[in-house]
């Protein structure tokens, strides 16, 4: 799934952040390292019109993927302003909240991070489980979805 593009109003949550994007990413990486994640990688693609940033990591041989949303703050008389700092803080706070539940033994790591579990999409590229479920929610709701037919053979 491609990165989500969101337009927010001035004054919306997180628009007052003073933490830049790179600092948020470093803090997320530190949280993941504290939880013994491995192969942590940041993939930035600034070649196109829209900058995309993806965080990839593993824990207990399970791959995870987090795509940072592309957030623009609406402006009246000027072009909308790219706010990756807001994107970074939102993802930072979400990961922090999930890992607090892990620290308190409410969830184990794989439960807490299940939304970000990387599974192959129809082309074989990694996709977050939350996005995969969203794309297939009609089939899931109707009871016609069978993940065994969606995965490459031998991956069940």
What are the functions of these language-model segments?
Residues 67, 72-156:
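Intrinsically disordered, low-complexity regulatory regions enriched in serine/threonine/proline
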Residues 1-27:
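Terminal, regulation- and interaction-focused segments at domain boundaries
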Residues 20-73:
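Compact, well-ordered interaction domains used in eukaryotic information-processing assemblies
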Residues 1, 26, 31, 46, ...:
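Detector for methionine-enriched segments
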């Amino acid at each position: 799934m491609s990165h989500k593009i969101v337009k927010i109003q001035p004054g919306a949550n997180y628009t007052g952040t003073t933490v830049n994007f790179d600092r948020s990413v470093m803090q997320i990486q530190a949280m993941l390292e504290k939880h013994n994640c491995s192969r942590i990688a940041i993939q930035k693609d600034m070649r196109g019109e829209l900058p995309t940033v993806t965080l990839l990591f593993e824990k207990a041989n399970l791959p995870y993927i987090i795509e940072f949303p592309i957030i623009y703050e609406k402006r009246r008389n000027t072009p909308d302003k790219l706010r990756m700092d807001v994107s970074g803080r939102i993802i930072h706070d979400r990961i922090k909240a999930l890992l607090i539940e892990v620290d308190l033994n409410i969830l184990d790591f794989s439960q807490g991070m299940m939304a970000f579990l990387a599974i192959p999409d129809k082309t074989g590229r990694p996709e977050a489980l939350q996005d995969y479920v969203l794309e297939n929610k009609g089939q899931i709701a109707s009871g016609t979805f069978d993940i065994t037919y969606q995965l490459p053979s031998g991956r069940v």
